[in-house]
Design a protein with these regions (language model features):
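Short catalytic-loop micro-motif centered on adjacent basic/acidic residues
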Residues: 74-76, 105-108, 237-242
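His/Asp/Glu-enriched, well-ordered alpha-helical/loop segment
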Residues: 202-235, 303-304, 308-310, 316-396
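Histidine/acidic residue-rich metal-binding segments in metalloenzymes
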Residues: 114-132, 136-310
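Histidine-rich, glycine-flanked metal-binding segment
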Residues: 1-39
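A glycine-rich helix N-cap at a beta->alpha junction
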Residues: 95-110
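Divalent metal-coordination and catalytic microenvironments
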Residues: 8, 13, 35, 46, ...
Length: 458
C-alpha cells in the first residue's frame, strides 16, 4: 500500500529494499518525498486507444497523458473484427513497441464466434482477460474497431452478442480462469427506448440516460451471472466495467450472495463527479452518467469496499468529431480521462473526506494488479516488485485544461475545474517519466508490454 517513514531503494528497475535510514546509501539519484504520499504506481484497467488513430500514434499521446496523471500501467481494451491469431494481434503488439511512456497490457474483446477459438492462444501470449459487449445486438450492433497499424479510415464492425456466443465465451474463459470483463446493458431495451425518445423529439444527457436505463444493466448482470454459475469451468471471474448506477450495484450484490462465481466492480471517475444535468454533450458516455443519488451511491460503494477498482474508460477523440451534429444521437460516446483519474479521487475523494488515501491506493493499484494477473510484479511497494511509484502532493492545486493533460483530445469534462491533489512524479520501473507535470521526451519507448498469467486474486 502506502509507504511512510521509509526509504525505497531501487536497482535494475526493481524495488531492492525498504530501509529506515538511507544516510549511508550511495545512489545515482536521491528523491526527497518528505511530506508527500508515495503510492504504488496507478494502473488504469480500462483504456481505449487505437480506435481513432492507429496505435503506433495513439500510444504516444495517451501514454504521455497517463504519465501526467500518475498512471504507470495502462490496459488497452482491444477490439479486432478478425481472428486474433494469424498475426493480427502480433501486428498490434509490434506497432505498440517503442511507443509507450508507461507500461501497458491488453484485454481482448471477443466479438464473433470465430474468435472464441483464439482464447487459449491469447492466454499463451499473456492476455488472460476477455471482454463481452452485452450491449451489442438487436439494431444497436455497430461499433468502431481498433485500426490496423498505419491505417486511418475508421473501421466499423457489426456485432450480435447472442446468448450462444456469450455462453461460449464464459465457458471457454472460465475453464482457463480468465477474467471476463462485462459491459452489461440490454440492447433490446435500449433500442426501444431510443426509438421512443427520437419520436418524441427529446435530446440531451437526460434523454440519453432515460434511453439506457439502469434496469437494463441490472437485467444483463443477472443474465451473465447465471451463465457464470453454470459454466463448465466451475464458476467464473466476472468483472463488471463502468458501473455507475445504484440499480447495477444492487444487482451485483444480489449475485454475490448466490456464490459460486467471483464478481468484481469497476467504476469510473465520471460516475463520481457528473450527473445527467451536466449541460454539455461532451459528457455522453455508455452507460450514461446518472442522478445525484447514483453519484452518492458510488462514493459509498467505493468507501465501503463494494467497488474493487477505478478505471477511466478513456477515449481519445477530438471535440469536432465528439459532438457530431450537435445532438445527443449523433455525438460520440466516450471522452478522455486517464490523466484526471488520480486528481479526481484525491481532490473529490480524499480532500473532501469521502475516502481515504489507502482506498485510493487499493482501487487504483493493488486490487487491479491482483484481479488482472500483475501482482506482485505491480500493485505493491515491496522488494522484488517493479519500481512503479506515484508521488502525490495532496495539497497541490491545478486548474484543469486540455493542454495540461497532454492527450490527443482537445477537450475534457473537467475543463476549468480546480482540483487539489496531483501526482508530481511518475516512476515506471525506476525511471522518472514525469516530474512536476513535465513528461521526459527521452522516456518514450520505456513502456513495455506486460504479459499476464493467471491472476492471484485471493
Amino acid at each position: 500500500g502506502i509507504v511512510s517513514d521509509t526509504n525505497i531503494m531501487i536497482e535494475d528497475e526493481k524495488i531492492k529494499a525498504l530501509v529506515r535510514s538511507a544516510s549511508n546509501v550511495s545512489a545515482s539519484r536521491k528523491i526527497d518525498a518528505t511530506g508527500k504520499y508515495v503510492l504504488p504506481g496507478a494502473i488504469d484497467p480500462h483504456v481505449h486507444y487505437g480506435v481513432y488513430r492507429p496505435v503506433n500514434e495513439a500510444a504516444r499521446t495517451e501514454s504521455r497523458s497517463a504519465a501526467v496523471g500518475g498512471v504507470t500501467t495502462m490496459i488497452r481494451m482491444l477490439r479486432l473484427y478478425d481472428r486474433y491469431c494469424d498475426n493480427n494481434i502480433g501486428k498490434q503488439l509490434q506497432a505498440s513497441r517503442g511507443n509507450h511512456y508507461v507500461d501497458y497490457s491488453i484485454h481482448a474483446s471477443i466479438l464473433r464466434p470465430e474468435q472464441v477459438r483464439d482464447i487459449p492462444y491469447l492466454r499463451e501470449i499473456g492476455i488472460n482477460s476477455l471482454k463481452i459487449y452485452m450491449n451489442l445486438g438487436s439494431d444497436l450492433n455497430r461499433i468502431h474497431m481498433d485500426l490496423a497499424p498505419g491505417a486511418y479510415e475508421l473501421k466499423d464492425g457489426v456485432v450480435q452478442m447472442t446468448d450462444e456466443l456469450m455462453s461460449s465465451i464464459v465457458n471457454n474463459g472460465s475453464r482457463i480462469h480468465s477474467t471476463i470483463l462485462v459491459h452489461a446493458e440490454n440492447p433490446v431495451i435500449c433500442s426501444e427506448q431510443i426509438l421512443k425518445a427520437k419520436q418524441n423529439g427529446v435530446d440531451g444527457l437526460e434523454a440519453w440516460s432515460y434511453c439506457r436505463p439502469p434496469y437494463s444493466e441490472a437485467q444483463s448482470i443477472a443474465k451473465v451471472s447465471d451463465l457464470g454459475r453454470r459454466s463448465s469451468g466451475g464458476g467464473s471471474y466476472l468483472y463488471f466495467v463502468h458501473i455507475g448506477s445504484n440499480a447495477a450495484l444492487d444487482a451485483i450484490l444480489a449475485e454475490r450472495q448466490k456464490g459460486r462465481s467471483n464478481y468484481y466492480v469497476e467504476t469510473c471517475p465520471h460516475y463520481l463527479t457528473h450527473t445527467n444535468e451536466f449541460g454539455s454533450l461532451i459528457a455522453k458516455v455508455t452507460p450514461p452518467i446518472r442522478s445525484k443519488s447514483d453519484v452518492q451511491s458510488m462514493w459509498s460503494a467505493l468507501r465501503n469496499g463494494i467497488v474493487d477498482t477505478v478505471g477511466t474508460d478513456h477515449v481519445a477523440n477530438r471535440l469536432e468529431m465528439k459532438v457530431g451534429k450537435g445532438d445527443i444521437w449523433s455525438a460520440l460516446s466516450g471522452f478522455p480521462g486517464i490523466a484526471t483519474m488520480l486528481p479526481v479521487l484525491l481532490s473529490k475523494g480524499v480532500n473532501e473526506n469521502r475516502i481515504s488515501i489507502e482506498t485510493v491506493a487499493r482501487v487504483t493499484s493493488y486490487n487491479t494488479a491482483r484481479i488482472f494477473g500483475m501482482y506482485p510484479k505491480k500493485g505493491t511497494i515491496q522488494p522484488g516488485s517493479d519500481a512503479d511509484l506515484t508521488i502525490v502532493d495532496i495539497d497541490l492545486e491545478k486548474i484543469v485544461t486540455p493542454d495540461l493533460l497532454q492527450s490527443y483530445s482537445d477537450y475534457t469534462i473537467y475543463d476549468g475545474w480546480r482540483l487539489r491533489g496531483w501526482p508530481i512524479m511518475t516512476i515506471v520501473r525506476g525511471n522518472p517519466v514525469m516530474e512536476d507535470g513535465e513528461v521526459a521526451n527521452a522516456a518514450l519507448g520505456h513502456g513495455e508490454f506486460i504479459p499476464r498469467p493467471v491472476a492471484i486474486r485471493d
